[in-house]
C-alpha cells in the first residue's frame, strides 16, 4: 500500500464502491478494467468523472475502484459518492464545492418494497365493477 493513498466508500441503491486515490496521470481502473471498458454507456462514465472535473483534478490523480452489487446506474452513483469522499480526505478545502454540487450527500432513494395484496409496491389489482 502506498503511503500517500486516500480512501472513500460510496453507496447508492444496493451498490457499494471502495475508491482509492493516489497522485498520478488520471488513470481510472474499476474492478481491474478501465472506465471505458467497464461502463459502456457515456452517461455512466460522465457520472463517475463529475467530481474530478468539478475540482479540476482529472489528469492529476489515479483511481483504483472496486464496486459490487446493483446495476449500472447504482454502481456509477456509488463510485461518484466514493470518489467525493476520497477527494475530501485528499484535500478538505474541496468540500464546499463538492457540497454545493450535491455530491457529498448520500442519495437515500431505493426500491420500495412490494406489499401484500398489491401487484407491485403501489399498483393495485384491477377493479371490476361487475
Swiss-Prot record:
The keyword Ribonucleoprotein applies. This is Small ribosomal subunit protein uS9. GO terms for molecular function: RNA binding; structural constituent of ribosome. Belongs to the universal ribosomal protein uS9 family. Pfam families: Ribosomal_S9 (PF00380). The lineage of its organism: Bacteria, Pseudomonadati, Pseudomonadota, Gammaproteobacteria, Vibrionales. One of its GO terms (cellular component) is cytosolic small ribosomal subunit. HAMAP family: Ribosomal_uS9_B. GO terms for biological process: translation. PANTHER family: RIBOSOMAL PROTEIN S9, SMALL RIBOSOMAL SUBUNIT PROTEIN US9M. The keyword Glycoprotein does not apply. Keywords: Ribonucleoprotein, Ribosomal protein.
Amino acid at each position: 500500500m502506498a503511503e500517500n493513498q486516500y480512501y472513500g466508500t460510496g453507496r447508492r441503491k444496493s451498490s457499494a464502491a471502495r475508491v482509492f486515490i493516489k497522485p498520478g496521470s488520471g488513470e481510472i481502473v474499476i474492478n481491474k478494467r478501465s472506465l471505458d471498458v467497464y461502463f459502456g454507456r457515456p452517461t455512466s462514465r460522465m457520472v463517475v468523472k463529475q467530481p474530478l472535473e468539478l475540482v479540476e483534478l482529472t489528469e492529476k490523480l489515479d483511481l483504483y475502484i472496486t464496486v459490487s452489487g446493483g446495476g449500472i446506474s447504482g454502481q456509477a452513483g456509488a463510485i461518484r459518492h466514493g470518489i467525493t469522499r476520497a477527494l475530501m480526505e485528499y484535500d478538505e478545502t474541496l468540500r464546499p464545492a463538492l457540497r454545493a454540487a450535491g455530491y457529498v450527500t448520500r442519495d437515500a432513494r431505493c426500491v420500495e418494497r412490494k406489499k401484500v395484496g398489491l401487484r407491485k409496491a403501489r399498483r393495485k389489482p384491477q377493479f371490476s365493477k361487475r
